[in-house]
Amino acid sequence: VEPFYAIKSNPDPMILYVLSKLGSGFDCASKDEIILAKSTGVPVENLLYANPTKDQSSLQFARSQDVDYLTFDSYCELDKIKLFHPDAKCIIRIKVDDSGSECKFNSKFGCTMDEVQELLSLAKIDKINVVGISWHVGSNCKIPGQFSKAISDARKVFNIAKEMGINIEIIDCGGGFPGTDDGPI
């Protein structure tokens, strides 16, 4: 297991520097977050551009910075990747049950399980290298079983990909466990 810290959760440069020196990778959602992560000296292979909706300039920027790991959840995104970062290593983001979380993401991010096979087929036809599966149970998830359900869904995607000759090497598990609030720090 290799941690990839979501910069959006706390972009303090000192925290990022320490995490980088401890060997953490970084989950980036924007050009600015890529720049911030790279300023820590982290190797580019430890950067994931995890925003599933990227514009042309963002994809070109990622490519110019050798940031190759990208997420996608639609054919529109695959089409942009094919045009502007064709050598990317792509990670399909799936919707999972986030009903136990305070901050939900699945209404706006991730493809449904019914869309997985078609998206993987289109990626294969377009010669887009799919190397992983991503999901996010939402922030502050209070139902541990949601993680098990998400892992089960990821396994289904893994099996579909395997049948298609796609080698999945990465599973990006998103979401956070709630901590305790014992007062001010």
Predicted feature locations:
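Active-site-proximal beta-alpha core segment in soluble small-molecule metabolic enzymes
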Residues: 2-170, 179
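A conserved active-site cap/scaffold subdomain adjacent to cofactor or substrate pockets
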Residues: 175-179, 184
